[in-house]
């Protein structure tokens, strides 16, 4: 679904956008959020993309960065402590309409002894229905239950918990084609159509528990504006409980902006561009982490997919894994090699000043990268079970592809295709499957990152 319940049923929302005066105008203009628009039809013939890709999900062509009134593109306002609900909106009484589904913006009714809410479709791996529990111990084992100690430089005494993904299921899907704007894309809305159908048919995500924001919809609350995106992010994580499974999917333009708080070793924050970014500004990774990651309690799964450029660390998750399932850390050897090459080059020229300057620059860069990495583990580690799949590294672009005559994002296609071919894969197997789907056509490298140290040999559940 792609509408919101009235504010009396939805207390959350970003306090900064739109301003209070604009909120009042919007409430006067839209006295109720109305009925949901018709659902997207199922998308068939999801075939491999053609080559070459017609475009890139990079920066929208424009002079400079979009205007914004603060370092992170939003008007600052007092924020509640992490783990608390966002400020209340002024209540108002909408016209009478049937009540929304209990799962949409509300806690589901209590059903003691009802068992897990999700048992999986045939072939889909769950913690209780997979090859490993049926005796094939060469298959990926399901995630453990209970708390797991962190280690790996995380705060001492801290623990996290894997989600078994049997609880409440909610999804936020955002696709922006930027109609009528420079840098218009073609496949982002199709990505949302395909993903919503896949989640509904294969993982039992109910349509009424999906918020869909695309710029082809007439309902103003369904447009992917900055205000709507931020409000929907708050809705997604509201009232989350252990073993819930939340899903976030963004397909659109992504980019980078100078980092102002020192949490990025390359000096740039990753951003996404709402449909109204030229007026409202972009959304920075720090803000997405604050809204969608930090409030989550232990045992809640958030699966995030960013099919956009420069998206490798779009949620600022500190644990990034290679296709060998190994935790990536700052590559000091690579930096050392580059630094040594510069020193040797300067020595060969007899330029002692440059040699010293190059050596000192390398030391500072390597030290800064290691310090940033350690600080990220201390401040961005989470007890929740947050997994992010991104279409490219921070320095790469992502392809806007054509799939059997239909425009779509390469990562969105590869993710669904890889899971359909083999639903019972470990994390590292799925990462390699996605990479293999992309490898024959594109240079982009998919990324897997997590909010906690991850055993990549465990069964991937969702």
Curated annotation (Swiss-Prot):
Region annotation (Disordered) ranges: 1-150
Keywords assigned by UniProt, alphabetized: Apoptosis, Hydrolase, Protease, Thiol protease, Zymogen
Function (record text): Involved in cell death (apoptosis).
Domain of life: Eukaryota
Active-site residues per Swiss-Prot or TrEMBL entry: 253, 309
Enzyme class: hydrolase
GO cellular component: cytoplasm
A GO term for molecular function: cysteine-type endopeptidase activity
Ranges of biased composition (kind: Low complexity): 22-33
Compositionally skewed regions (Pro residues) per UniProt: 1-21, 49-69, 77-102
EC id: 3.4.22.-
InterPro entries assigned: Caspase-like_dom_sf, Metacaspase, Pept_C14_caspase
Organism this protein belongs to: Coccidioides immitis (strain RS)
Family: Belongs to the peptidase C14B family.
Pfam families reported for this sequence: Peptidase_C14
Identification of the protein by name: Metacaspase-1
Record carries keyword RNA-binding: no
GO BP annotations listed: apoptotic process; proteolysis
SUPFAM superfamilies in the record: Caspase-like
UniProt key word Protease: yes
């Amino acid at each position: 679904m792609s509408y919101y319940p009235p504010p009396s049923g939805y207390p959350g929302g970003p306090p900064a956008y739109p301003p209070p005066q604009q909120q009042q105008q919007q409430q006067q203009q839209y006295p109720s959020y109305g009925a949901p628009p018709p659902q997207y039809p199922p998308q068939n013939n999801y075939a491999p993309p053609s080559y070459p890709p017609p475009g890139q999900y990079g920066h929208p062509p424009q002079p400079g960065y979009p205007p914004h009134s603060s370092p992170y593109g939003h008007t600052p306002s007092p924020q509640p402590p992490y783990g608390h609900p966002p400020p209340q909106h002024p209540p108002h009484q909408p016209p009478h309409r049937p009540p929304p589904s209990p799962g949409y913006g509300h806690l589901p009714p209590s059903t003691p002894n009802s068992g897990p809410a999700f048992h999986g479709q045939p072939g889909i791996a769950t913690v209780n229905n997979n090859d490993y529990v049926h005796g094939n111990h060469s298959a990926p084992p399901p995630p453990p239950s209970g708390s797991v100690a962190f280690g790996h430089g995380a705060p001492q005494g801290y623990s996290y918990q894997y989600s078994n993904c049997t609880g409440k299921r909610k999804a936020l899907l955002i696709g922006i084609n930027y109609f009528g704007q420079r840098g218009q894309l073609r496949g982002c809305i199709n990505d949302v159509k395909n993903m919503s159908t896949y989640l509904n048919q294969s993982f039992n995500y109910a349509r009424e528990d999906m918020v869909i924001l695309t710029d082809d919809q007439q309902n103003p609350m369904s447009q992917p504006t900055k205000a709507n995106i931020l409000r929907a992010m708050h809705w997604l994580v509201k009232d989350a409980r252990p073993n819930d499974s939340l899903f976030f999917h963004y397909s659109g333009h992504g980019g980078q902006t100078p980092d102002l708080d020192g949490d990025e070793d390359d000096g740039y924050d990753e951003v996404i561009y709402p449909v109204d970014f030229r007026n409202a500004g972009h959304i920075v990774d720090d803000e997405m982490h604050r809204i969608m990651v930090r409030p989550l309690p232990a045992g809640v799964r958030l699966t995030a997919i960013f099919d956009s450029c420069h998206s490798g660390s779009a949620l600022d998750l500190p644990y990034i894994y290679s296709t060998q399932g190994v935790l990536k850390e700052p590559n000091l050897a690579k930096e050392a090699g580059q630094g040594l090459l510069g020193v040797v080059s300067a020595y060969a020229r007899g330029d002692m000043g440059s040699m010293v300057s190059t050596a000192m620059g390398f030391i500072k860069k390597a030290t800064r990268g290691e310090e940033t990495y350690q600080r990220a583990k201390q401040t961005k580690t989470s007890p929740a079970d947050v997994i992010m799949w991104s279409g490219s590294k921070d320095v790469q672009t992502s392809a806007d592809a054509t799939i059997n005559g239909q425009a779509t994002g390469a990562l969105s296609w590869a993710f669904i295709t890889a899971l359909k071919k083999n639903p019972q894969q470990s994390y590292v197997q799925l990462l390699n499957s996605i990479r293999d789907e992309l490898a024959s056509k594109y240079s982009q490298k998919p990324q897997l990152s997590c909010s906690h140290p991850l055993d990549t040999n465990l069964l991937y559940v969702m």
